[in-house]
Amino acid sequence: MAPLSATGSLSNMWSNPTAMPSFDDLRLETSRLILRPPRVEDLDAWSEMMLDEPTARFIGGVMPRALCWRALMTMIGAWHAAGFAMFSVIEKKSGRWIGRLGPWQPEGWPGPEIGWAIARDCWGKGYAVEGAIVATDWSFDTLGWSSVIHSINPANVPSQRVARKLGSRNLGPGKLPPPFANDLVDLWGQSRDEWRERRGQLPIEQ
């Protein structure tokens, strides 16, 4: 779905709530995961993940439930206003919400990002790579992106490994907009052409 323009389409939606785009049927699947747009009922699991310090360390730090609600509503709102945002990650075998990942590009961001955050008890299973592969495919094919980045703290070695498995390389230090302006990040990334050239060599499950 193409992003909504700032004129015409949005004003029509506000005057006609039934015109709001629906993403209820959007699902990306792998053999082990379902990726779908976030929902209000994801709040409990989202909040639990963000209360875990090792998980939250590089994604804004530990957040109380009230701030998690704001973050979740921002993600849901971005889907409706821009036509994309991160997906909720559902583990097929349990039906459980285990994280969020996918496309993200707030105002002032240094590029179109594919990001990931997986609950700590699901680390080491290859879920971040598996989900990021299909989210990257979708971003290139559906959103028409020509490149992707991953903003990664230099100390975040696990996320660096994920980026390498996706075929991305370290492009050097980057700068994020407020409220992350003081965060240290390296920008990892690759072009759409590079992605498609390597796509058949990427792992599906780890």
Can you say where each PLM-predicted feature lies in the sequence?
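Acyl-donor (CoA/ACP) binding surface of acyl/acetyltransferases
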Residues: 2-58, 73, 86-206
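Active-site rim helix/loop that mediates acceptor-substrate recognition in acyltransferases
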Residues: 64-83
